[in-house]
Structures are given as structure tokens and as C-alpha cells.
Amino acid sequence: MTEREQEKAYLHWLYRTAGVGSRGFMRRMEQAGTAREIYEMARAGILEDRLDVRYKEKAQKLQVAARTEDVTGEYERMRERGISLLTLQDAAYPRKLAAVRDAPYVLYYAGRLPEEERGAIALIGTRKCSAYGRAMAGEFGAALAEAGILIVSGMARGIDGIGQWAALQAGGYSLGVFGCGVDICYPSENMPLYERLLAEGGVCSEYPPGTAPRAALFPPRNRIISGLCDGVLVIEAKERSGTLITVDMALEQGREVYALPGRATDALSVGCNRLIRQGAALVTSPEEVLEELQAEPTRSASAAVCVQQSLFLPEGLPGELLKLLDYTPKPLELLQEAYREAYKTPVTVSGLCHGLLQLCAAGYAGQTAGAYYLTGVRHT
């Protein structure tokens, strides 16, 4: 193990033992030197005498750990699991993130980190999204990724996870930023996305492996999401959405903010509409975001959806029904009437339901409150 890797081993020990944050860590470094020197003082039982009284409890904890733990062995086991550690001094540390105030001194990651020369967008929004929000997250995630834009988000339920899945489905790159250790899939229902991020993209966190998700860890995480990106795109957000925390941090960091407009009566768009009123860039298509980033679209968003669907375009009644769907949920009565007008022949309710259920099972369509809509991205 090189001298640099040995220092990282002691850093890892320090982080997982004391739970050191960015500011606290820098104070300790200024007072006590390197992580290895802190370890040596802890092992000798003199650390609490060298640090500020505010850190006495942590110092005592470190002194106990220094006498009992295998520092280098623990670090090597972490590396064997495919988890790496970077510091602000490493050339591989993301430059965009390094430039922001209070960038995390240590960054754990698995998979691949984003390519610095490519544009990056944080695609974020509410967890309990509407059918329209799901569709837009999929459409923007796929189209931006196809144009070479990196999609960064928190792998949360709803908008975040849908946009990241769409980016991977389109053959692009996505990075998940966690409010827990990178070895923990949270929420657990997103395990398929987590596994794909590890294989085709990456995940990162300032918290050491094994750190369980807690509510207090997620707001600080948001500064990393925005810090890694050129801009933040808000798909849907309620009035008091946690998404707006990321927006505030993005503005502090000098990042661009984009928002999709929504209906005035839509509670899930109150946050977006307010952002637009306050100066966020209104966008209605991926091409508008690409124009802001000065990136060339590879195809239109609607074309991206069509190409994905044409690979496995269903035949017969399901295929005919697919052409009648869009991102606004439609009840059975409306679809039955639209089918009769489009194909000049009636369809029974049972036949209609059977065809729609086939589309839902294949991932082409979704259902909400008895109405059906186009998902835009097949989750297969």
C-alpha cells in the first residue's frame, strides 16, 4: 500500500469512527495534522488533550477505536467491495464539486464518476409525482442522456429515480448521490436501479460505507447533487417540497435552474411555477435545456420515445391503443370514443381493458384512478 493509500486508510477510519463532517474535519486537520497523526495520538491516549474541548467526546471515542481496530485491513476490505475514497487533494475528485463552498473533503464512490468535460444536469422533483411528472421525467432523462448529458440525482422514489432509469435505458450515464453509505440501497425498492447504476453509471456519498439513511443526512447531500452539475432541472415540486433545498443550494453555487411549468391548480406544480416567477428558466422540452447547455440534441424527445417503443411495438389492438395515448391520463370512455373515431370501428370495454392491461404490463402505459397514460420509457 502506497503512502497516499495509507493516509486514505486512516481517513476512512477517522470518518467511520467519528462521523467527521467537512468543517469539523478541516478543524481537526489544522489542529492535529494528518489523519495518521490523529490516529497515532489517539492510540497513545493523548488526542483529547490536543483538540478543542468541544470534541472531547469524539476524541475519547477515537482513542478507544485506535487501540482495537485494524485500520488498513478495514480499508482494504472496503476497496475489495469496489468502493473507493477520494479527497479534495486527488486529481480524480470532480472539479465542479471541488469548486463549491463546503465541498465534502472525502467522497466515497462505487462504479464510475462523471466525465468532467461533459455537461451535467441534476434532474429532480417530488417523490409522489403525477402521471405527467413520471412521463416528463422519463422523456427529459432519456433525451438529455442521448445527447450526452450526464444525469445526476438522489435515486429517490418518484421523479429522481424515474429520470435516472430513463437515462440508463437510453444508453447514457447517471450518478446517484446518497444520504447514506454507497453500499446501502435506499429506498430498497430501487434495487434494480441501484444495481444498474453500479454497473453502468456510479453512486457516491460523503458518508462512509455502512452509514444508515437518516433524515438529517439528506439536506447536506443535496449540495453535492447540485455541485456536480451545470444546472438543476425541476420536473415537479410542491410548495414545500424538499426539492427546493437543492434549488437553493444550486443558486448559492451559481448553477442554472430550470423548471417545467404546470397548471395553476396543480399542487404538484406550485413549486415549479413559483421558481419560474422568481426567475428560473421555463423549459418545455429537452431541446431547450440542451440549447442552454450548448449541446446538440441527437433526436427530439418525442422521437426518443418513439424509437424506444418501435423496438418492441405491440401488434393488433394494443398497438392501436398505444397511438391514442399521451401523457395526460384518459378514462376508458374517452379512449373508447377515440378508438371508434380513429379506426372507424367500435371496441368493447372488455377488449379495451385487455389491450390496455397488456400495454401496462409491457411498460408502455400506466394507470391512475381508472385512467391510462403513456409512460414514455419502458422499464424493462
Where are these regions (language model features)?
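Short, small/acidic-rich helices and loops at N termini and domain boundaries
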Residues: M1-A92, A362, Q367-T380
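Glycine-biased, small-residue-rich flexible motifs in mid-sequence functional cores and linkers
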Residues: T2-E5, T87-T380
